[in-house]
């Protein structure tokens, strides 16, 4: 158990937050607090020069109630001015400009968009001119890709050789469609990336212990993954339900796309197990804000 002291809304009202890591003996993400904002980073990515990345937490924003306090969604009923201030605070803490963010339009597809200079600010300073985009890739310095979460799986990709990046949102539908592999293939096509040189990461999301699904979902995983992987991905229960491991599924997808095992970072941090620290759709029964994954090129 990891304890941090947090000023939830930067009002001098400090509280102790317990972070439950999934496997205490495994490598963890770094917990960073700057300017009152707490966010997460990967040690492996921190060693790659020329890139910026982060995964937000609930701590350090100005939103209230069920959105407390670092909500990054404009569409869940929070005040727009609070959400904009949250973006500003997070960007300042991590070290990029809010105006450089490009956001996804997540609808559980496997669509991956090539992001260019013209996209700068989409979803933040101007409306998005696209829909149905769950993944993005770019090689434009200064742009920061952003995708959003409250249990689904963030997938990060960095190609330090060609200075290119990818960031994708993978719920169970995106995992069945292997959006992680689609993202890598698009990076190969657009930038000449070699998968063996790409560093990948699976982000904080719902763990297998918390993720119960029905037979119809498992049928799609059986169709998408070879039988020798099934035992690692899910197990059945007497009531006919299953516990599904989206972390392992996306890890296998990254390996299948050609990434090296030693280049893949895992989160060991479950959104549903940490409802005070991270937003979780399941833990909150849908009454929540959104977390954000961010990845950019300096």
Which residues make up each language-model segment?
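Active-site microenvironment for binding and transforming phosphate-containing groups
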Residues: 2-298
């Amino acid at each position: 158990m990891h304890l941090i002291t947090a000023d939830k809304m930067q009002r001098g009202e400090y509280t102790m937050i317990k972070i439950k890591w999934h496997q205490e003996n495994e490598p963890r993400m770094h917990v960073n607090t700057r300017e009152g904002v707490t966010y997460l980073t990967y040690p492996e990515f921190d060693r790659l020069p020329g890139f910026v990345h982060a995964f937000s937490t609930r701590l350090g924003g100005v939103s209230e109630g069920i959105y407390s306090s670092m909500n990054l969604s404009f569409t869940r009923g929070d005040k727009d001015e609070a959400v904009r201030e949250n973006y500003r605070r997070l960007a300042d803490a991590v070290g990029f400009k809010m105006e450089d963010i490009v956001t996804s339009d997540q609808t559980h597809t496997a669509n991956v968009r090539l992001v260019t200079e013209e996209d700068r600010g989409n979803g933040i300073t101007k409306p998005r001119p696209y829909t149905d985009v769950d993944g993005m890739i770019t090689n434009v310095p200064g742009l920061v890709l952003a995708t959003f979460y409250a249990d689904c799986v963030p997938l990060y990709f960095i190609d330090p050789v060609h200075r290119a990046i990818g960031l994708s949102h993978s719920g169970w539908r995106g995992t069945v469609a292997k959006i992680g592999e689609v993202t890598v293939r698009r990076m190969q096509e657009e930038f000449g990336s070699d998968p063996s040189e790409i560093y990948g990461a699976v982000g904080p999301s719902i763990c297998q212990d918390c993720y119960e699904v029905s037979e119809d979902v498992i049928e799609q995983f059986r169709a998408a993954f070879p039988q020798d992987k099934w035992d690692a991905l899910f197990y059945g229960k007497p009531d006919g339900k299953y516990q599904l491991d989206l972390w392992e599924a996306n890890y296998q997808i990254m390996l299948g796309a050609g990434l090296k095992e030693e280049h893949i970072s895992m989160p060991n941090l479950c959104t549903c197990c940490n409802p005070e620290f991270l937003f979780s759709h399941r833990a909150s029964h849908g009454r929540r804000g959104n977390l954000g994954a961010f990845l950019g090129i300096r």
